[in-house]
Amino acid sequence: MARFYRRRKFCRFTAEGITHIDYKDVELLKQYISDNGKIVPSRITGTSNKYQRQLATAIKQARYLALLPYTDNHQ
């Protein structure tokens, strides 16, 4: 019987050597927001604690400045 092994998650920011997450980098921040506008937790993305805090702060700043939506499109 074959066992399914889940691929180990890793922090993308540590691997790429990114030291600071900028709130103006909207394309990067969109990858860490769910379809309904919530911040995706680090247990799903594999982001380390340090960068998850920076990510949350950057997303909140971008939302405040209307670069990102608070919620999804209600239709």
Curated annotation (Swiss-Prot):
GO terms classed as biological process = translation
Q: Name one GO cellular component term.
A: cytosolic small ribosomal subunit
Presence of the UniProt keyword Zinc-finger in the record: no
What keywords appear on the UniProt entry?
A: Ribonucleoprotein, Ribosomal protein, RNA-binding, rRNA-binding
Annotated GO molecular function terms are: small ribosomal subunit rRNA binding; structural constituent of ribosome
Is Isomerase among this UniProt entry's keywords?
no
Query: Pfam families of this UniProt entry?
Result: Ribosomal_S18 (PF01084)
The record's listing under PROSITE patterns reads: RIBOSOMAL_S18
Q: Which family does it belong to?
A: Belongs to the bacterial ribosomal protein bS18 family.
The job of this chain, per UniProt, is described as: Binds as a heterodimer with protein bS6 to the central domain of the 16S rRNA, where it helps stabilize the platform of the 30S subunit.
List, alphabetically, the PANTHER family matched: 30S RIBOSOMAL PROTEIN S18 (PTHR13479), SMALL RIBOSOMAL SUBUNIT PROTEIN BS18M (PTHR13479:SF40)
SUBUNIT field: Part of the 30S ribosomal subunit. Forms a tight heterodimer with protein bS6.
Instruction: Write down what this protein is called.
Output: Small ribosomal subunit protein bS18
Organism (species): Psychrobacter sp. (strain PRwf-1)
